[in-house]
Amino acid sequence: MDLSAASHRIPLSDGNSIPIIGLGTYSEPKSTPKGACATSVKVAIDTGYRHIDGAYIYQNEHEVGEAIREKIAEGKVRREDIFYCGKLWATNHVPEMVRPTLERTLRVLQLDYVDLYIIEVPMAFKPGDEIYPRDENGKWLYHKSNLCATWEAMEACKDAGLVKSLGVSNFNRRQLELILNKPGLKHKPVSNQVECHPYFTQPKLLKFCQQHDIVITAYSPLGTSRNPIWVNVSSPPLLKDALLNSLGKRYNKTAAQIVLRFNIQRGVVVIPKSFNLERIKENFQIFDFSLTEEEMKDIEALNKNVRFVELLMWRDHPEYPFHDEY
């Protein structure tokens, strides 16, 4: 696989392609300064990123859209050069809500289509505008999932030209098989966005996805920010790992660059999230070196099956994906 800063798209099973590195745009709406996301996306595009990963529930898609449109207006990129991934949240799984939800994202972005639209989690929550619905006692309000019905509504969005490719996120093997074996399947999921890094290499899920032509996109590819609401903070920080740092010295790279290179060398798309402008540039400098087979094996051996993003608050949901081995 010949990847370079100028040319690093890999094929998807539907004939489209995806840039192997993207900018993640997740942010805490309350603590992120206005405009930080737009600035980050503009710097990323100037740096060479062509893949932006976002979601309506990040509450910053308007900034992402503004940045993309500004770079198109400047003549820096064309719309077809940019790959935008949007997400269908858990409160919008009801089939008749899928298209209006995507159309709302398109209105916010002020774009005609998204390149990839994915079901963000396999768990359905009570439909409505409340992103995290709970009752008066703080108990989560779930909704019965029907992933196949939701998928059919996604397929209709692709047929209508609102999205080029369809995928999923946080799906385990059983949930992927539900879609793959669906009678009358029109469009296969092209990707599954999951946590993936040297402490959580996902060998079995990766193999299953490769057998079915499903690309793995790695969120939290550098470990993760250590927010105790979401993250198992007892887990060791990935970027302090001795092996990753010694490889960094060998190649005159940071541990983060080694980690990103490791995943792209195995065909895993990475979407490191950063609003730090220097780090955005640094994360992209991974095309001017490659790891040896031996080094790849050494990094693979770091796997501890440590999942940072456990989503434990939803572990009693019938479709909670992480009870299964993979």
Curated annotation (Swiss-Prot):
Effect of residue 133 to R: In CBAS2; highly reduced KM and Vmax with cortisone as substrate. Increases KM and decreases kcat with testosterone as substrate. No change in NADPH affinity. More thermolabile in the absence of NADPH. Reduces 5-beta-reductase activity
Result for mutant: residue 120 to A: Loss of activity
Summary of pH dependence: Optimum pH is 6.
Broad class of enzyme this protein falls into: oxidoreductase
EC number(s) on file: 1.3.1.3
BP GO annotations: androgen metabolic process; bile acid biosynthetic process; bile acid catabolic process; C21-steroid hormone metabolic process; cholesterol catabolic process; digestion
Tree of life domain: Eukaryota
Binding locations of NADP(+): 22-26, 53, 169-170, 193, 219-224, 273-283
Cellular localization per UniProt: Cytoplasm
Catalytic activity: 5beta-cholestan-3-one + NADP(+) = cholest-4-en-3-one + NADPH + H(+); 4,5beta-dihydrocortisone + NADP(+) = cortisone + NADPH + H(+); cortisol + NADPH + H(+) = 5beta-dihydrocortisol + NADP(+); corticosterone + NADPH + H(+) = 5beta-dihydrocorticosterone + NADP(+)
Record-linked CDD domains: AKR_AKR1D1-3
Chain residues that bind substrate: 26, 58, 89, 120, 132, 230
Active site: 58
Outcome of mutating residue 261 to C: In CBAS2; decreases protein level; accumulates in inclusion bodies; lacks of 5-beta-reductase activity
GO molecular function, one term: steroid dehydrogenase activity
Family: Belongs to the aldo/keto reductase family.
Disease named in the record: Congenital bile acid synthesis defect 2: A condition characterized by jaundice, intrahepatic cholestasis and hepatic failure. Patients with this liver disease show absence or low levels of chenodeoxycholic acid and cholic acid in plasma and urine.
Name recorded for this polypeptide: Aldo-keto reductase family 1 member D1
